[in-house]
Every structure is written in C-alpha cells, then in structure tokens.
Amino acid sequence: MASSDGSDVETQSLLNSGDRTLRSWKDTVFPGISWDKSIVWITVAQIIMYIISCVLSRSYEPNERTLMLLGAAYAPAFSNFQLWRVVTPLFLHATILHLVLNLVFILHISLRLEERYGTKKFLVTYFLSAIVGNLLSMLMQPWALSVGASTAGFGIIGGMAAEVSVVWCKLSEELKRIYSMDICILAVLIYFLSFGRTVDTFGHLGGFLAGVALVCYYNKEIEDLPKWFRVLFYGCSALCATILVVSPPLLLLRYPYRVAATS
C-alpha cells in the first residue's frame, strides 16, 4: 500500500510553487504593493468614483454631463471659482479601458517612487504634478473637457527620468537599457491611451515638468551631481512656478461669464 506522505509532499510543493509564481507576477507588475501605500488607496478611490460616475450616467461609461458635474477640468467652470477642478479630474475616467490602463501603469511606477521617497514626498509629487498639468491644460485648451490621472502619471515618469539621469553615468549598460525602455514604454502607452479622441499634451507636459523639478529637489544634496543638474532643476522649477502663479488669474479673468452656457 502506497504511503500518502509522498503525494502530500508533492501536492504541497505544487501549491508552494504556484504561490511563488503568483507572488513573482505580483511583484513584477506591482512591486512592493501593500495597503500601507497611499497610491493603493488613491487607486481604490478612483475605482469607486468611476462606479459612481457610471451610476449617475445610467450607463457602463460616464457621459460628459456627469464628468462635468463631478469635477472634470474645464476652464470656463474653473473661472467661476470652481478651483477644485485642478485636483478632481484625477479621480475621473472616461471609459473602463481608460481607467484600467491609467491605473495599472501609474500604480506600477508609483509604487517604486513611494517606496523610494516615502508617502509625504510621493503625495506632494503626485498631486502637485496633477495641479500643474491641469492648470496648463486649461490655460492652453480652455474648451476641452479633461479627466484622468495621466497628469500625475507623467509627473511620476518625469520623476523617474530625473532620478535615473542623475545617476546615469554610474549605471551599468544593462540597467541603462532597462530604465530607458521602462520610461519610454510607459510614456508612450499613457500618451496614446489618454481621454477621448485627443491627447492632453499640455497636461502631460505640465505634470512631467513638475515631477522632474520635485525629484531633482529631493536629490539636490547628492554628491558629484552632473553639471547640468542645476540648470534642469532651476529651469523646471521656474516653469512650474510660472504656471502655478500665472495660470489661475489668467483663467479667472479670461472666462468670467462663460460657465452659464455649459450648464
């Protein structure tokens, strides 16, 4: 009579192997994911808001009226002192595909940045990138309705690019190829999978500049920084400061009576 010990060991080995494979897949796609990461809770909030927007629209996808009601970036509405529209677009998405693609890629890259710099610095980078991006977007494309987390996503990409460029000369050729490919693929995917039929180029640009400026600031005490580091840091910081200071008054003065036509 055959002992069951061997089969039990084999079964347990298979289960452990499957568990390791699952953990390996999870760590590859979402490195270091856990409930103590703020980006995980932001992602949950974005999913909840998408469900709410679909319920209000009575459809599987939110309509423009609902997105407008819930806080999409729209310059004429911002000019009516609806200042929250620089942040609320982060939690709104136009389609389920838009939601999934934005969140998967942004979650993937954000986990690394939050682990590296901590929750406070990560949140500053995430939200300030979105604010700068949405302000620039509304200033340059005032009649476009914009939603999505890609302004913040490009801030994270900008931060990654800045961090890698600072230590570029110290990386091996293999790491250089890996980082270059990672940043390029993420940028291209988020760029081409943005809201609607158009791409919010200015929103992405503003977010990217803010991410570069902030991560340069976090690393400014590193020894042996490249000669161009200060130019990059002060240049991006000056552009972001200009957007933050100039955009709100221009938007408030430029469209003071237009919001009534959009209701």
UniProtKB/Swiss-Prot annotation:
Compartments reported by the entry: Membrane
EC number: 3.4.21.105
GO terms of molecular function: serine-type endopeptidase activity
Function: Serine protease involved in intramembrane proteolysis and the subsequent release of polypeptides from their membrane anchors.
GO cellular component, one term: membrane
Active site: 150, 204
Pfam families found in the cross-reference section: Rhomboid
Organism of this sequence: Toxoplasma gondii
InterPro entries xrefs: Peptidase_S54_rhomboid-like, Peptidase_S54_rhomboid_dom, Rhomboid-like_sf
Transmembrane segments: 37-57, 86-106, 121-141, 142-162, 189-209, 231-251
Family, similarity comment: Belongs to the peptidase S54 family.
Membrane topology according to the record: Multi-pass membrane protein
Gene3D superfamilies given in the database record: Rhomboid-like
GO BP: proteolysis
UniProtKB keywords: Hydrolase, Membrane, Protease, Serine protease, Transmembrane, Transmembrane helix
Record's catalysed reaction(s): Cleaves type-1 transmembrane domains using a catalytic dyad composed of serine and histidine that are contributed by different transmembrane domains
Protein name: Rhomboid-like protease 3
PANTHER family reported for this sequence: RHOMBOID-LIKE PROTEIN, RHOMBOID-RELATED
